[in-house]
Structure formats: structure tokens, C-alpha cells
Amino acid sequence: MPREVYFYDPPDRFVAGTVGLPGRRTFFLQASKSGRTTSVALEKAQVSALAQRIDELLDEVVRRSGGTSDVPAVAPAELSDTAPLDAPIEEEFRVGTMALAWDADSERMVVEAQALVELDADSDEDLAAAEEALLQDDENGPPMLRVRLTGQMARAFAKRANDVVNAGRPPCPLCSLPLDPEGHVCPRQNGYRRGE
């Protein structure tokens, strides 16, 4: 079966969002354009890392351009998107590998999210070789979401992604673990009393 690539250049909308209550949220990347929507599931840590890396890459683009780039230092207010994910949310795949690149010729950020694939290998070297072969296989590789964004769109995506990650459960002031509405067993209190 040929590889499925969900390609948006540029999308009308590209956001990170969640479904569910804090502590039980499922995280998604969602791209849409002209009535077509693609949603892929991923972990909270992946959303956080993606937002951080996008900001770092954009900062580097601005630094190398000497300030002449169209990339803004902060997310433009007019691109702020706080709307929920577009319904219905149908997961195309769960993300395993992500990649970022900056296309200097078109001044676009390229975000790729590939499906999680389990590989059987006898050694670390075999596993590394199998992973590399799979990622380079343009015809039979895992499904992939590929999105090309302007610098402004990428900054807006990163801001929203950080906001979504930070909108979860507040941390315990003692141990920094997330607090559930009913509290939690705090290791810094020897697990005997519930943190508030």
C-alpha cells in the first residue's frame, strides 16, 4: 500500500488541541484547508517539544537574517486562535517521529509528523538501520502529516501549543507533580497526606 501523506501548503488552520478533561486529555495536531481536515494524536511531551523547537528555529532564522526576516519575534495577535479543534475529530494515526525544517528559499517552516511504527530488531544497530530505511522510504513508509507554514503562522502555532500544554492540571507546590481535583499523594510528604 502506498504511503499516505497529508500535505498542507499552507493550511488555513494548523493547531494543537485537546479532547477531554485535564489529567485525561488526548492531544492532537490538526491541519485543515478548504473543507479537508487531518487530525493526528500525540503525547503532551511531543506537543511541548514541538512548540519549543519551532520557537528556537524561528529565533535562529531571525538571528541569522540580522533582523531582516519576515519572521516575528512573538506570535502576531491577529493570528491568535483559541477556538476548539474542528469536529469531528477522527485520528488518522498516532505520531511517532517529528521533524522540522526551514526552507530559506520560500521562507517557510516545514513540520512533519510520521506515524508510530513498531520495528523488530535483534540489536541497536539493526534497529537504527531499520528506522532509517523506514523514514527514507517515500513509497511505503508510515503515514505522514506534512505542513508548510509562514513564520507568522509557525509563531502562532507555537504560542497556542504552549498555552494548550500549560492549561492542564496545576503542579503541586512541593513536588511539582500534577494535582488532581481531589488532591494527590505527595512524595515530599511521605505519601501520608494529600497535597492541596
Which residues make up each language-model segment?
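Intrinsic, low-complexity N-terminal interaction/targeting segments
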Residues: 1-27, 68-137, 141-144
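Short Cys/His-rich local motifs and their 1-3 flanking residues in nucleic-acid-associated proteins
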Residues: 177, 188-191
